[in-house]
């Protein structure tokens, strides 16, 4: 983390008799030497703690990855052979469109599909790449697209370079096990490769593996490709562009503690370096605008059931899911007490915030017909049994939960943001040497991008929360505090990393048990249906 740069201005001491002073140093000199040695010892101990944490993290990833991969591959095998050897829910549309491409019908489009053809083009490539080496069914081969992406490309190609720059922040193997992604490794859905391409765009922008210019253009290209899987990824292109500009502006324009000035410096740097930093992403925005004008909607196909609106409660749903999945990251005595102290010290402010949330619940809640009609999704039961159980429950129970979730979302990020000196410039002079952290500018951009991607959607769909969680999680440094107790002042995030990985696998296990245990029959479907996210 970039912190305030402190310059040591203390003097050791001056002696009237040089000879005597060498033999008999003053008390001030002794104290100064002692303090210096103590500081050096602290630095050495801290470095050892960091080194130990990094080494343990590397070993943990190397050990856990093959175990998790074998488990996911086994589950994929059982589902494709006995558990689910037929198309499931939206797969009927995705597989149908891919089959049209495989038959050479490139201009035929399934009217029920709402996303661009990125997945179907990738499925076409996957099929032709594997048809000579396997006699598996077409459905199995197409599902293999997401399994390969989830257990190989996602942790090793996308997350590994980011991990090398933020080894204390996250483990790639943990994010590989993230439940909202892992559940779709076995199905033919758009979410896995949508996430892979847009986070790879972030990876290229931060790590710069091909040099600055080439990496930024490749980042923009990956961002554009990601929009072929999900249109709302254009919003995350904005965040990545802001990060690209910001990481250079903070060095060349000398960011300080005056936030408004930093915004002005960012704008000025954007204008001065438009061609090299902004143009690659501006091309994406121009192409997306052309698509909107041509299609007259952000949605392809079934526009009537996917009309954009102002579903602000969706933002609280997203924060609630983020808080739930990140329990091992934030749960501690300090977070709990600070939230309670905030309430006790300023109850009026707390009640006004709750009132604001209740008003949003009242006037900006959208209940889509699909939510109430499709009992094959966990959200159906969450809304029926919890969120929309009754008016009393909706306002008196869910509003405080939303409030606490928002508090967790903000407070966990706060210690991980960069801090600048009010006067002194940043010592780092190359963007690639900067830590993977947000500033107050990119932090605000992250919140706004999350809001813009989830609020317009009328559907209560947890898959839409994958990228808000991933982008939030990648920029967080794991808290060193124990789960319950006083801070010990050491770098000790390993237990939390292990707990986070275990937490994800427990959730995956529960969702798999629900999937296998409960069979649902629909009159319109000839096959047995199951429950997924």
Swiss-Prot record:
GO BP of this protein: dolichol-linked oligosaccharide biosynthetic process
Keywords: Endoplasmic reticulum, Glycoprotein, Glycosyltransferase, Membrane, Transferase, Transmembrane, Transmembrane helix
Glycosylation sites (chain numbering): 80, 135, 295
Broad class of enzyme this protein falls into: transferase
Signal peptide (residue range): none
Pfam families in UniProt: DIE2_ALG10
Residue spans crossing the bilayer: 54-74, 139-159, 162-182, 184-204, 205-225, 234-251, 274-294, 312-332, 351-371, 392-412, 440-460, 465-485, 498-518
Membrane topology (UniProt): Multi-pass membrane protein
MF GO annotations: dolichyl pyrophosphate Glc2Man9GlcNAc2 alpha-1,2-glucosyltransferase activity
Catalytic activity as recorded in UniProt: an alpha-D-Glc-(1->3)-alpha-D-Glc-(1->3)-alpha-D-Man-(1->2)-alpha-D-Man-(1->2)-alpha-D-Man-(1->3)-[alpha-D-Man-(1->2)-alpha-D-Man-(1->3)-[alpha-D-Man-(1->2)-alpha-D-Man-(1->6)]-alpha-D-Man-(1->6)]-beta-D-Man-(1->4)-beta-D-GlcNAc-(1->4)-alpha-D-GlcNAc-diphospho-di-trans,poly-cis-dolichol + a di-trans,poly-cis-dolichyl beta-D-glucosyl phosphate = a alpha-D-Glc-(1->2)-alpha-D-Glc-(1->3)-alpha-D-Glc-(1->3)-alpha-D-Man-(1->2)-alpha-D-Man-(1->2)-alpha-D-Man-(1->3)-[alpha-D-Man-(1->2)-alpha-D-Man-(1->3)-[alpha-D-Man-(1->2)-alpha-D-Man-(1->6)]-alpha-D-Man-(1->6)]-beta-D-Man-(1->4)-beta-D-GlcNAc-(1->4)-alpha-D-GlcNAc-diphospho-di-trans,poly-cis-dolichol + a di-trans,poly-cis-dolichyl phosphate + H(+)
Record's GO cellular component terms: endoplasmic reticulum membrane
Pathway participation: Protein modification; protein glycosylation
Main location: endoplasmic reticulum
Disulfide bonds: none
E.C. number(s) listed in UniProt: 2.4.1.256
Entry's localization field: Endoplasmic reticulum membrane
Recorded superkingdom: Eukaryota
Alphabetical list of PANTHER family matching this protein: ALPHA-1,2-GLUCOSYLTRANSFERASE ALG10 (PTHR12989), DOL-P-GLC:GLC(2)MAN(9)GLCNAC(2)-PP-DOL ALPHA-1,2-GLUCOSYLTRANSFERASE-RELATED (PTHR12989:SF10)
Known function: Dol-P-Glc:Glc(2)Man(9)GlcNAc(2)-PP-Dol alpha-1,2-glucosyltransferase that operates in the biosynthetic pathway of dolichol-linked oligosaccharides, the glycan precursors employed in protein asparagine (N)-glycosylation. The assembly of dolichol-linked oligosaccharides begins on the cytosolic side of the endoplasmic reticulum membrane and finishes in its lumen. The sequential addition of sugars to dolichol pyrophosphate produces dolichol-linked oligosaccharides containing fourteen sugars, including two GlcNAcs, nine mannoses and three glucoses.
Family that this chain belongs to: Belongs to the ALG10 glucosyltransferase family.
Protein's name in the database: Dol-P-Glc:Glc(2)Man(9)GlcNAc(2)-PP-Dol alpha-1,2-glucosyltransferase
